[in-house]
Amino acid sequence: MAAPPHILFAGTPVFAAIILRRLLEAKYHIGAVYTQPDRPSGRGRRPTPSPVKDIAITHQLPLYQPATLKDKGSQAQLAALAPDLMVVAAYGLILPATVLQIPPLGCINVHASLLPRWRGAAPIQRALLAGDKVTGISIMQMDAGLDTGPVVHTARYPIHPKDTAATVHDQLAELGAEALLQCLPSLLEKKANIATLQDESQACYAPKIRKEEAWLDWSQPAVLLERQVRAFNPWPVAQTQIGGKTLRVWSAAALAQTANALPGTLLAVHKTGIDVATGNGTLRLLEVQLAGKRVMTVQDYLNAHTLTPGIVLVKNPGKAKSP
């Protein structure tokens, strides 16, 4: 009886951990796991293992955490594992051409967008910011470019009007696992998968999210600000200044109603929301958070804080206290 295909898995965050868990539940032989080195986390800045590492330890899988795969030592170590196929999901390290050539069946990547749209590090957030109606998963054969390889399989996910980066992430992680499990048998059996070359004319990129992008610019339309709130939940969380303090906005709704007021002006305060004037329309804040406090509904916030219509919320962080 032939030995089962030797799969090497590389991934780091929860997205990848969900996919690894599903592979193990499907009884695939994971010969080794690669994940990023432990990172300082929390107030104590203690080294914290990745979610993928936790699963590897639980299942007693051989585990490797190189800081890079560009040096010959790391490449030789990986080659010695003799993988038939390498599955990559949100690993976070660049795989040099030398590494891509090691598995005879190649390296495949589970990417959280419908390629060639949103190549890069933050496809979920960029799709929400752009107001995309549909996103999805692409299973692609990796090459030397940034998410440029031929696409083996896709699965679509319609974005709900109330979806956040958190909810889309969870949906795509499960969808990615399902998509991978659908095409993996034919990849391992060397059957002819129809890999589609990407249309370069349709390519766009999803650069990593920067913290400063979280500041709400009230001169923008309410629709765009609502997208920003959804795209930056759970990180870095949309925020503004109120009374010289930083207020994080976890949930909001764009309203068509307009007001003859300076963008950022607090228009109305009621139990269902805090209405703020924007460059076009009104943004109703629904869930907020002050520094050092829990996330709360506007009603809970107003039980402890008094707000007066007419004050102006500002974008410039200045000397605002960080959450």
UniProtKB/Swiss-Prot annotation:
<dbReference type="InterPro" id="IPR005794">
    <property type="entry name" value="Fmt"/>
</dbReference>
<dbReference type="InterPro" id="IPR044135">
    <property type="entry name" value="Met-tRNA-FMT_C"/>
</dbReference>
<comment type="similarity">
    <text>Belongs to the Fmt family.</text>
</comment>
<dbReference type="Pfam" id="PF02911">
    <property type="entry name" value="Formyl_trans_C"/>
</dbReference>
<dbReference type="InterPro" id="IPR011034">
    <property type="entry name" value="Formyl_transferase-like_C_sf"/>
</dbReference>
<dbReference type="InterPro" id="IPR036477">
    <property type="entry name" value="Formyl_transf_N_sf"/>
</dbReference>
<dbReference type="GO" id="GO:0004479">
    <property type="term" value="F:methionyl-tRNA formyltransferase activity"/>
</dbReference>
<dbReference type="Pfam" id="PF00551">
    <property type="entry name" value="Formyl_trans_N"/>
</dbReference>
<keyword id="KW-0808">Transferase</keyword>
<keyword id="KW-0648">Protein biosynthesis</keyword>
<dbReference type="InterPro" id="IPR005793">
    <property type="entry name" value="Formyl_trans_C"/>
</dbReference>
<protein>
    <recommendedName>
        <fullName>Methionyl-tRNA formyltransferase</fullName>
        <ecNumber>2.1.2.9</ecNumber>
    </recommendedName>
</protein>
<dbReference type="InterPro" id="IPR037022">
    <property type="entry name" value="Formyl_trans_C_sf"/>
</dbReference>
<dbReference type="InterPro" id="IPR001555">
    <property type="entry name" value="GART_AS"/>
</dbReference>
<dbReference type="GO" id="GO:0005829">
    <property type="term" value="C:cytosol"/>
</dbReference>
<feature type="binding site">
    <location>
        <begin position="113"/>
        <end position="116"/>
    </location>
    <ligand>
        <name>(6S)-5,6,7,8-tetrahydrofolate</name>
    </ligand>
</feature>
<dbReference type="InterPro" id="IPR002376">
    <property type="entry name" value="Formyl_transf_N"/>
</dbReference>
<comment type="function">
    <text>Attaches a formyl group to the free amino group of methionyl-tRNA(fMet). The formyl group appears to play a dual role in the initiator identity of N-formylmethionyl-tRNA by promoting its recognition by IF2 and preventing the misappropriation of this tRNA by the elongation apparatus.</text>
</comment>
<dbReference type="InterPro" id="IPR041711">
    <property type="entry name" value="Met-tRNA-FMT_N"/>
</dbReference>
